[in-house]
């Protein structure tokens, strides 16, 4: 009797199970790394915007006099003199937000984070949730991601 060449069903099932185990370990780590990269990009963009706003205030002795809205609202004040191109979206493709006053004495630049919606309150310090807002106010981060992230 001639023996047929090929893999048995058991061998194929074992290979599929091993691939499934590897995927179960690798995919969450990959998604975490992608979200971490989006956070870092968002923080860098917010820091660049804040630097442009601070440079504007050095020249004019006040921050841009513009109410709250999306960051594009202050583009005429800072582009191209203080920043070459205004980033209009964060790492999750949500609009970067601006909160200012009409007197030009304060400002806040923030991202809604992965969740895409505003937090009910901001904490002064670090967060461990990708969905938390990233907040920069008057020269420093007020709420920022740090450490092991969830969600």
Each predicted region: which residue ranges?
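N-terminal single-pass transmembrane signal-anchor helix
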Residues: 2-31
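Short acidic linear motifs
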Residues: 9, 17, 48-51, 55-56, ...
């Amino acid at each position: 009797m001639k023996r047929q060449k090929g893999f048995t069903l058991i061998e194929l099932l074992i290979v599929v199970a091993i691939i499934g185990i590897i995927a179960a370990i690798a995919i969450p780590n990959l998604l975490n790394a992608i979200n971490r990269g989006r956070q870092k990009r968002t923080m860098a963009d917010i820091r660049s915007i804040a630097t442009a706003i601070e440079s504007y205030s050095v020249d004019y002795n006040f921050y841009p006099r513009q109410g709250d809205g999306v960051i594009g609202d202050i583009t005429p004040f800072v582009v191209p003199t203080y920043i070459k191109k205004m980033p209009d979206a964060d790492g999750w493709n949500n609009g970067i937000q601006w909160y200012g006053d009409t007197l030009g004495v304060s400002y806040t630049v923030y991202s809604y984070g992965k969740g895409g919606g505003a937090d009910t309150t901001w904490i002064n310090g670090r967060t461990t949730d990708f969905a938390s807002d990233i907040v920069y106010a008057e020269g420093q981060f007020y709420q920022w991601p740090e450490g092991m992230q969830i969600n």
